[in-house]
Design a protein with these regions (language model features):
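Alpha4 helix (beta4-alpha4-beta5 surface) of REC/receiver domains from two-component response regulators
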Residues: 68, 75, 88-115
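Two-component/phosphorelay signaling modules centered on CheY-like receiver
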Residues: 3-6, 15-35
Length: 116
């Protein structure tokens, strides 16, 4: 790992989304994807081991939703977070809750991304 690069951990249950984000971020020489996780429990262990500078976090995942994970993360290991998820009209309040919990950025995931 290059210490001058921004280390990113991608947390998303969709293999397609993890792959697309990894490929897109690889285009930037100053960014290094240090790992991926399919759920918050795996992510927790990887955060401790890999020490990312920033994480991308899906809103809806199995075993623990993104809000619950973000609340725990900000309490015990605060760090920059970019939310990646499908934000519909009904999910607007969810997006606001993420912002309240210190989300660095929220990115709306295109609805077709998981259908590939």
């Amino acid at each position: 790992m290059d210490k001058n690069k921004i280390k990113v951990l991608i947390i998303d249950d969709s293999a397609v989304t993890r792959n697309i984000l990894s490929l897109e971020l690889a285009k930037y020489p100053e960014i290094e994807v240090v790992g991926t996780a399919i759920d918050p429990y795996i992510a927790r262990n990887k955060i401790v081991k890999l020490e990312p500078d920033v994480i991308t976090l899906d809103i809806e995942m199995p075993r623990m939703d993104g809000i619950t994970f973000l609340e725990k993360l900000m309490r015990y290991h605060p760090m920059p977070v970019i939310i990646i998820g499908s934000i519909t009209d009904s999910g607007y309040q969810t997006a606001l809750r993420f912002i309240e919990l210190a989300t660095t950025e929220t990115v709306n995931k295109p609805r077709f991304i998981d259908s590939y």
